[in-house]
From Swiss-Prot:
Pfam families: Pterin_4a. This is Putative pterin-4-alpha-carbinolamine dehydratase. Keywords: Lyase. It is an enzyme of class 4 (lyase). The lineage of its organism: Bacteria, Bacillati, Cyanobacteriota, Cyanophyceae, Synechococcales. The keyword DNA-binding does not apply. It catalyses: (4aS,6R)-4a-hydroxy-L-erythro-5,6,7,8-tetrahydrobiopterin = (6R)-L-erythro-6,7-dihydrobiopterin + H2O. It comes from Prochlorococcus marinus subsp. pastoris (strain CCMP1986 / NIES-2087 / MED4). It comes from the Bacteria. InterPro entries: PCD_sf, Pterin_deHydtase. GO terms for molecular function: 4-alpha-hydroxytetrahydrobiopterin dehydratase activity.
Length: 96
């Protein structure tokens, strides 16, 4: 998938398409909470495999049972269709 920057109208519609994610100036972000560290780390491991498949890696942090993920396409300087795709796949994993 060749990434392209999302236009203003696409960004306005993005929240409805990827529930739970906040649209920021140059990235999208979401916080995920789990009952313990093992669940949080397991979630991160699943996401790592998706990101590797797309060759697109998030900025993220993990503190015990909390995972915060920030997605942007640094090469293009903002939020792209690839960020949207990965956010959607992350939501699918979280909801399982």
């Amino acid at each position: 998938m060749k990434p392209y920057l999302l236009e203003h109208e696409e960004l306005k519609e993005l929240s409805a398409k990827i529930g739970g994610w906040r649209i920021m100036t140059n990235h999208i972000e979401r916080e995920f909470n789990f009952s313990n560290f093992v669940e949080a780390f397991s979630f991160m491991t699943k996401i790592a495999l998706i990101c590797e498949k797309h060759n697109h890696h998030p900025n993220w942090e993990n503190v015990y049972s909390k995972v915060i993920i920030k997605l942007s396409t640094h090469d293009l300087g903002g939020i792209t269709n690839l960020d949207q795709t990965i956010a959607s796949e992350i939501n699918d994993i979280f909801e399982k």
